[in-house]
Amino acid sequence: MKDYLVKALAFDGEVRAYSVRTTNMVSEAQRRHDTWRTASAALGRSLTAGAMMGAMLKGEQKLTIKVEGNGPIGPIVIDAHANGDVRGYVTNPHVDFESTEQGKLRVYQAVGTEGNVTVIKDIGMREPFIGQSPIVSGELGEDFTYYFAVSEQTPSSVGVGVLVNGDDSILAAGGFILQIMPGAQEETISFIEERLKKIPPVSTMIEKGLSPEGILNEILGEENVKVLETMDVQFNCTCSRERIESVLISLGKAELEQIRGEEEETEVHCHFCNERYKFSKDDIKQLIETL
């Protein structure tokens, strides 16, 4: 099944809802970064949240999420675009812990329970929107829920989950965001709160084959959900050799001459997708000649 995202309204507009399957996206991130199980879950949950938060934007808008906890994986950084392109990395991918007795990955131990979630939105204004909230659990779903409440004053429920196989490959990943709109009735809020207590983990629902629409129907009741739009989501990095060449050219002639004199081969590493671009002395010489 391919990855995709659903935007919906529920209860006659009282609830805005997003749901997404990100199994392939998280698998691609795991492959590129060689993340171990707990790091995969942390990165995958963050990518999933990023995909849904990106879908709240329009046109060419984009956002960056930084989860900076005091755990051993270090900062997690996600870039998400309104068109469904998402990329991201975790600073230390080789982090894993023993699962709990219930088989749950200890994501909070990897992320840490102190620190901040920062969201930077480039929405075409002169200055970006920057929102920040403290990490409350390190499990990420609760941390993004708290972010929406504190920074965007939007009562929300964020569920994100990743199931990882014994060989570190990704079995299932996805999530949902429910947002209560102004004027929502108490009955609606109570209904959702009760449903959220009863549903299985979102990653389990995806493993069992539920679609993003199926997840929203499971939580909100099929008769209450009105799907507005579906869109593809994918791990897609904007880096390329041409872009790296432009960055090198921007260093100027003197610095490029110095690099060429000191290095047999220059390597530039993209943190987001782990791609490495190599430039020989002749490559650098050709770049200098364009200046």
Curated annotation (Swiss-Prot):
GO cellular component: cytoplasm
Transmembrane feature ranges: none
Location relative to the cell: Cytoplasm
SUPFAM superfamilies the UniProt entry points to: Hsp33 domain, HSP33 redox switch-like
Keywords from the UniProt entry: Chaperone, Cytoplasm, Disulfide bond, Redox-active center, Zinc
UniProt cross-references to InterPro entries, sorted A to Z: Heat_shock_Hsp33, Heat_shock_Hsp33_C, Heat_shock_Hsp33_N
CDD domains attached to this UniProt entry: Hsp33
Gene Ontology BP, a term: protein refolding
UniProt xrefs under Pfam families: HSP33
UniProt-recorded name of the protein: 33 kDa chaperonin
